UniProtKB/Swiss-Prot annotation:
It comes from Mus musculus (Mouse). Belongs to the DEAD box helicase family. DEAH subfamily. This is 3'-5' RNA helicase YTHDC2. Disruption phenotype: Mice are viable and reach adulthood. However, both male and female mice are infertile; male mice have smaller testes, and female mice have smaller ovaries and show progressive loss of germ cells. Mutant germ cells enter meiosis but proceed prematurely to aberrant metaphase and apoptosis, and display defects in transitioning from spermatogonial to meiotic gene expression programs. Mutant testes reveal an up-regulation of N6-methyladenosine (m6A)-enriched transcripts. Residues 1-50, 1179-1303 are annotated as: Disordered. Coiled coil: none annotated. One of its GO terms (biological process) is oocyte development. One of its GO terms (molecular function) is RNA polymerase binding. The keyword Cell membrane does not apply. 'Ketu' is a harbinger of misfortune in Vedic mythology. 3'-5' RNA helicase that plays a key role in the male and female germline by promoting transition from mitotic to meiotic divisions in stem cells. Specifically recognizes and binds N6-methyladenosine (m6A)-containing RNAs, a modification present at internal sites of mRNAs and some non-coding RNAs that plays a role in the efficiency of RNA processing and stability. Essential for ensuring a successful progression of the meiotic program in the germline by regulating the level of m6A-containing RNAs. Residues 218-384 form the Helicase ATP-binding domain.
Length: 1445
């Protein structure tokens, strides 16, 4: 692309924004695109010399942006720009197209030169040949299956693509019938309500602002079909409006039936209980609630509170479900969650069908005009609140009045003078660099303009911002500083690449920070490497944890250095890495610099110093603690409500208050700390509403749930972090992220309104006035920022039969873009949830029932059929929620965190394994009471783990409700976990769920390729990015990582794209056979398999190579085409066998989907056995590891322990007093007072195991335990160093058996059979003194100790017993052998002999994976193996003794 001389060079703006009015950076069509990398033009293959800024008129920039955005989301494949454009304007379009992932080309000459932009076509990517070589054993396993059970004609035809649409009505009726029991509201008839009872709340009700408008509200609802009610939070609208309707119907003798929806489960239960109490009724009579998997309703219930999701599921059973309903109230409409918008779309349609139905929308901060337009001029009732005055304090006021400062703010003030000097030196560096590096461009560029431009930024952006976490500069010895400075200067000024070796050496051996700054210029090694174009060193630095957001004294980040000096490859690399970091756009310092004119000089300086000291992306817990202390010591009594974005921050702040901050921890009797989160149990929430005892202050840590759903009347002080966690989704890249973003103005006003309910209050806002002015008016509707696959499934169940999904969603209050809907529908077709006519398949109906995204739902259902459910439940819930590994800020810790993640993978080339084993090790640490220390040590989030447990419980509950997991017999929890220990099988379920997220290894070019990507890289957080973890990562890290892969296929959870580079994270290496059997559609075209001869005759070109040599070798290979991209070349016999195995699997899967509860047939069992044999054999032949212990059942949590289904519970010794829900119902405040939990309040685990406590819990994992089996046997190996809990240092006597410890299993060897007979008669045993201490300790530390007996040389186990006393000093004369120690009591459970061959398959990881029978006396068994060994006795016919050999 020839660049005309009129394009004047100018460095990019430091934040990556474009120059001129366009702005907007290099990315997704903001208002410009000035900063993107220039393409090298269609002709030139070389790198662009420099990324010069392209200056064109702002109108052209904006017009081009709009045109390209429309094109991106539209149907056209190609778009042409007029030939009247100048070459500069064309250059701008080329660059912007490239940054948007489009292909642009210019054709023609002179005045006829025009430019076309095309969308990338998947087929464009040439890829390496996809092959699959089967081992002899694999072929044998498939042959045996096919000989015994050939693929039947019925199976074959069922798996052919449909040619015509089936009878939709019949299928739909059958499937709706099948799934209607789950999570629906029951069908009652309207009745006249009973008279309300008088209660203690009557006077309070009458004082509510809404009470005055009772008659007006009832009258307007009677006269209109739709009514909007806007009332300030706490005005009483949620609890009173449904009661006004009940009372009116009672008075006039009119039957009614009312549904009232809430956005959250917690609110639905809380409001229902409150309303029942106000009417002096028990919950479940007139007033009830229903949430997913839990309900309290009866035939008398006339007012049901439910979640939006439950009402939607009810409507999915058909429109007639509302025929007996008189009123539907949709509360908190302003939250605009996807279900409420979706519900309104459906309800608007239903209002025409049900003339008597009334719809009431209630909200605190409604975008009223939108809804008036949507429902066609309906009346609006406004209810004023009666709050007292609330004073506002913004960030600058807080800093000024409280005098808050921190080390970094002080340091910043000192650094300012130094910084000016650094800028001057930096400018000299640039000019020196340009003298040596770019003589030809030197004539055009005046160096002065560089410094002038950056002087405009006052004192140069976030210069000292990232030195803050580094103690290094002040602690380093002078020779180190001198040495580092010299190295960085040499690299920059003399292109001395060898100096990097010394830099890496100093970072690792002398503890110099990887973000060390050159003392005279403030440049880091990453900036210097980026500006100089040293790509592999940039990669190395990033993998060592270098901060890509660090800024030099002129405000430039490494990315700006790379752009300015024309290093396009590094620009791509840094942008792709930055794009994949989970941050919203929160930087406030730039705002202060640009718009801070109305700030006083003092406030401006304060804010600038603060923003230099703290990263806006996070929540400043230090500042919150400072404020808390100030409030508690200088303000009157009154509850404090603190709004935080998520559970992580809530737990972090709670721990500071209760344990870490001495000012509070030493005075816990003065505070009650409560936590509110939507996934939390209601018991804590009920206590929040009660007034605390005198002299005790209530501190409530909450997410945005306390904005509207829950009103706490005694709140006087609100601390608002200004943040919320929001899921956002890029529909074009299919990437979902949980981002922390700024709240909307409407939310900020709501939060302020929570103070001053009982007297004047204060709202402390941890953001500036300027930030507040720049906030969005209302939150973006979830419908516009969420992945729509789940919603499209629900649409099919709600929309009329012949209405397309897109047509139905276009009726929403703010419809999502058509392209996003189309992409979602296409994805559902790809994963077999829908057919070509957009009708749901059998799989689709089940996926609509599961509370996770469809691809994860498919993964879980495949795991049920493959019988490896537990590991997949854990992995699926983790992927659905978030990565439990936290990213530390310091570079040295980043490396340690990476190493920890790597240890959890156990050499399996799988990030998914790291997630699974981290969860298992955390559960083990939790049962041993040291999970907090464990999480800190392994860089894990305690909060995330607790949420994952609750999600598992909910998902398992849904599988039970749908009939996939039975209570007992075939299909019970044990049966669906038969293969959980086999990692190859677990990965098959992962592959089935992850498809089409696959990449292929091109060994020849050492790159990864995808269906639409020519080049894919591992994200630095993936363990696969650093195969052999070395202290210094290899220079060509990605290539080394690719070469180390044992197979040619990878699955990934998420791909982030930026420019020409795609990053994949959460990957696992899988075998080609897994891809061939589990990927692609279930229904393959009849010509999917092309035999070699026909392959030649058809003349289909071989796209893998042009060389004749290769043509000859592929000529005798068959082709098996699974989809447009997956096209395998393999031996004809292998192709035919694999196609048949695929057909057997898919027909089995289809049968299970049609009848989940039906018993398995012989064919089904044989198919699964063959698949497992094939997967295991191929996994072994690829040299992939099979770690032990992955199938361990998680520890069941008793009902008080489930964090989501119940109150939060932690066995951590430091925390348990703060957040254990004690059996005596004491409040949190009282709990805080107790320094240690009383043992009496924890019933011993033994009784729990016997089912005496909580005998029935349908959602719990434990309803399937036999007397022997105990799922408490989890004792997980912790892969990170020192798995044992930190010891107290002093030997302590154990007071009583610890309740929450795992069960232990030991082998007892006897020299003769007579001793065993004595033991069985008298119930006693003795062992050698060397075993005594071990057994005694196990007896005291665990809930149960099982002893498995074997007489040496007998070839049998002779039974097992339970140890029922500790070992005493008294010895027995009965034993014939000398050298035995004291006697202890045992309780024999099974006395039958079990031949060793029954246990051949059991290997003990705690004895070098030897078979269990090869054990010495006193050998401990790994708990899961012990449990499996005991279960073998269940298979022996009862009472029938096997004789010993």
């Amino acid at each position: 692309m020839s660049r005309p001389s009129s394009v004047s060079p100018r460095p990019p703006a430091p934040s990556g924004g474009g120059t001129g009015g366009g702005g907007g950076g290099s990315g997704g069509g903001g208002g410009g695109g000035g900063g993107g990398p220039a393409s090298c033009g269609p002709g030139g293959g070389g790198r662009a010399k420099g990324l010069k800024d392209i200056r064109i008129d702002e109108e052209v920039k904006i017009a081009v942006n709009i045109a390209l955005e429309r094109f991106r989301y539209g149907d056209q494949r190609e778009m042409e720009f007029p030939s009247s454009l100048t070459s500069t304007e064309r250059a701008f379009i080329h660059r912007l197209s490239q940054s948007l992932g489009l292909v642009s080309k210019s054709k023609g000459k002179g005045a006829n030169r025009y430019l076309t932009v095309k969308k990338k076509d998947g087929s464009e990517t040439a890829h390496a040949m996809m092959t699959c070589n089967l081992t002899h054993n694999t072929k044998h396993a498939v042959r045996s299956l096919i000989q015994r059970f050939p693929v039947t004609n019925k199976e074959r035809t069922e798996l052919l693509p449909k040619t015509e649409r089936g009878n939709v009505f019949a299928v739909e009726a059958e499937n709706r019938e099948m799934s209607k029991t789950s999570g629906r509201l029951n069908n009652g008839i309207p009745q006249v309500p009973v008279k309300r009872g008088e209660s203690e709340f009557d006077s309070f009700r009458q004082s509510l602002p809404v009470f005055e408008k009772q008659e007006e509200i009832v009258k307007i609802i009677k006269e209109n079909k739709v009514v909007l009610i806007v009332g300030e939070t706490g005005s009483g609208k949620t609890t009173q409006i449904p009661q006004f309707l009940l009372d009116d119907c009672f008075k006039n003798g009119i039957p009614c039936r009312i549904f009232c929806t809430q956005p959250r489960r917690l609110a639905a239960i809380a409001v229902a209980e409150r309303v029942a109490a106000e009417r002096r009724e028990r919950i479940g009579q007139t007033i009830g609630y229903q949430i997913r998997l839990e309900s309290r309703v009866s035939p008398k219930t006339l007012l049901t509170f439910c979640t939006n999701g439950v009402l939607l599921r009810t409507l999915m059973a058909g429109d007639s479900t509302l025929s007996t309903v008189t009123h539907v109230i949709v509360d908190e409409v302003h939250e605009r969650d996807r279900f409420s918008d979706f519900l309104l779309t459906k309800l608007r349609d239903l209002l025409q069908k049900h003339p008597t139905l009334k719809l009431i929308l209630s909200s605190a901060a409604l975008d009223v005009n939108l809804f008036i337009r949507y429902f066609g001029s309906c009346p609006v009732i406004y209810i004023q609140g009666r709050p007292f005055e609330v004073k506002e304090m913004f960030l600058e006021d807080i800093l000024r009045t409280t005098g808050y400062t921190n080390k970094e703010m002080l340091k910043y003030k000192k650094e300012k003078q130094r910084e000016e000097k650094q800028q001057t030196t930096l400018t000299e560096w640039y000019s020196a660099q340009e003298n040596t590096f770019k003589p030809e461009s030197q004539r055009q560029r005046a160096v002065a303009s560089v410094s002038e431009e950056y002087d405009l930024l006052d004192d140069g952006g976030d210069a000292v911002f990232s030195q803050l976490t580094e103690k290094d500069v002040n602690c380093l010895e002078p020779w180190l500083i001198k040495e580092m400075d010299a190295c960085l200067s040499d690299i920059w000024l003399h292109k001395d690449v060898d100096a990097f070796a010394q830099v890496f050496h100093l970072i690792l051996t002398e503890n110099v920070s990887v973000d060390y700054r050159h003392s005279e210029t403030s440049a880091t090694a990453l900036m210097v490497a980026a500006g100089r174009g040293f790509t592999s060193q940039v990669e190395q630095l990033i993998s060592m944890g270098a901060n890509v957001h660090s800024k030099a004294s002129n405000g430039w980040m490494a990315l700006d250095w790379a752009k300015h000096f024309g290093q396009t490859e590094i620009v791509d690399l840094l942008e792709s890495y930055s794009a994949s970091l989970e941050f919203g756009n929160l930087d406030e310092s730039s705002l202060v610099q640009t718009n801070g004119n109305d700030l006083s000089a003092e406030d401006r300086e304060l804010l600038k110093a603060y923003h230099h000291s703290f990263d806006d992306e996070k929540v400043d817990l230090d500042l919150i603690m400072h404020l808390l202390y100030n409030i508690c010591h200088s303000c009157d009594a009154g509850a404090i409500l603190i709004f935080l974005p998520g559970y992580d921050e809530i737990v972090g702040l709670r721990d500071r208050i209760l344990f870490d901050d001495k000012r509070f921890a030493d005075n816990t009797h003065r505070y009650q700390v409560f936590m509110l989160h939507s996934n939390m149990q209601t018991s804590d929430q009920k206590k929040v509403l009660k007034n605390p005892p005198a002299g005790v202050r209530k501190i409530i840590l909450s997410t945005n749930i306390a904005e509207t759903s829950i009103t706490v009347n005694d709140v006087v002080f609100v601390i608002d972090s200004g943040k919320v966690k929001e899921k956002s989704f890029d529909a074009l890249n299919f990437v979902t992220m949980l981002k922390m973003v700024w709240i909307s103005k409407a939310s900020a006003i709501q939060r302020k309104g929570r103070a001053g309910r009982c007297r004047p209050g204060i709202c402390f806002r941890l953001f500036s006035r300027l930030r507040f002015q720049n906030m969005l008016e209302f939150q973006t509707p979830e419908l516009l920022r969420m992945p729509l696959q789940e919603l499209c499934l629900h649409t099919k169940l709600l929309a009329p039969v012949n209405c397309t999904i897109a047509d139905f969603l276009m009726k929403a209050p703010e419809p999502p873009p058509a392209l996003i809907v189309r992409n979602a529908v296409q994805m559902l077709k790809t994963i077999d949830a829908m057919d070509a006519w957009e009708d749901l398949t059998e799989l689709g109906y089940h996926l609509a029932d599961l509370p996770v995204e469809p691809h994860l739902g498919k993964m879980v259902l495949c795991a049920v059929v493959l019988k490896c459910l537990d590991p997949i439940l854990t992995i699926a819930c983790t992927l659905a929620y978030r990565d439990p590994f936290v990213l530390p800020t310091q570079a040295s810790q980043k490396r340690a965190a990476m190493l920890c993640r790597k240890r959890f993978t156990a050499g399996t080339f799988s990030d998914h394994m790291a997630l699974l084993r981290a969860f298992q090790a955390w559960q083990k640490a939790r049962s041993d009471g040291w999970e907090r220390a464990f999480c800190e040590k392994n860089f894990l989030s305690q909060a995330t783990m607790e949420i994952i447990i609750g999600m598992r419980t909910q998902l398992l509950g849904q599988l039970r409700a749908s009939g996939f997991v039975r209570a007992r017999g075939g299909g019970d929890i044990r049966d669906v976990n038969t293969n959980s220990e086999n990692w190859a099988v677990v990965k098959a379920a992962l592959v089935a769920g992850m498809y089409p997220n696959l990449v292929h290894v091109d060994r020849e070019n050492v790159i990864l390729t995808g269906p639409k990507e020519k080049k894919v890289r591992f994200h630095p957080t993936s363990v696969l990015s650093q195969p052999q973890y070395k202290k210094i990562p290899p220079a060509n890290g990605q290539a080394a990582a690719i070469q180390a892969l044992p197979t040619d296929w990878l699955i990934y959870d998420e791909m982030t794209r930026a420019h020409r580079i795609a990053n994949i994270r959460c990957c696992s290496a899988v075998t080609p056979v897994t891809v061939l059997v589990f990927c692609g559609p279930a229904r393959l075209a009849s010509n999917a398999l092309q035999e070699p001869s026909s392959f030649r005759a058809d003349g289909i070109p071989n796209d893998s190579s042009d060389s004749e040599m290769e043509d000859r070798t592929t000529a005798n290979l068959a082709a098996l085409k699974l989809d447009e991209w997956l096209n395998f070349k393999l031996e004809p016999e292998a192709a035919s066998l694999l196609l048949q195995l695929r057909q057997k699997w898919h027909s089995l899967f289809l049968r299970r989907m049609r009848a989940p509860s039906k018993p398995w047939s012989q064919v089904d069992e044989a198919t699964i056995r063959a698949i497992i044999a094939v997967l295991s054999t191929e996994e072994q032949s690829a040299g992939l590891q099979q770690p032990s212990g992955i199938g361990q059942r998680p520890r069941p949590m008793s009902s008080e322990e489930l964090p989501l289904a119940s109150s939060w519970r932690s066995n951590n010794s430091r925390k348990s007093t703060a957040d254990t829900e004690f059996a005596d119902g004491s409040t949190t405040g009282e709990r805080v007072l107790m320094k240690s939990p009383s043992p009496a309040l924890h019933p011993p685990q033994k009784y729990k195991d016997r089912g005496i406590l909580h005998p029935k819990r349908s959602t719990d994992d434990r309803s399937d335990q036999s007397s022997v089996k105990s799922t408490d046997s989890s004792s997980y190996p912790s892969p990170c160093a020192s798995p044992s809990p930190p010891s107290s240092g002093k030997g302590s006597k154990s007071p009583s058996p610890r309740p929450n410890m795992p069960i232990r299993y030991f082998i007892m060897k006897s020299s003769n059979l007579r001793n065993l007979e004595i033991s069985q008669q008298k119930g006693i045993w003795s062992t050698t003194p060397s075993n005594e201490r071990k057994l005694n300790r196990a007896f005291w530390e665990s809930s149960m100790v099982y002893l498995v007996f074997s007489v040496q040389g007998s070839g049998h186990f002779q039974g097992f017993s339970r140890m029922s006393s500790e070992i005493g000093r008294e010895k027995s004369q009965d034993w014939g052998s000398a050298g035995l120690g004291g006697v202890f009591k045992v309780e024999w459970i099974r006395k039958e002999s079990l031949p060793f061959q029954f246990a051949h398959h059991l290997l003990n990881p705690w004895n070098d994976n030897k078979k269990v029978q090869i054990s010495r006396d006193g050998q401990e068994l790994e708990p899961q193996v012990g449990e499996q060994l005991l279960q073998l006795w269940e298979r022996l016919p009862l009472g029938e003794k096997t004789t010993s050999d």
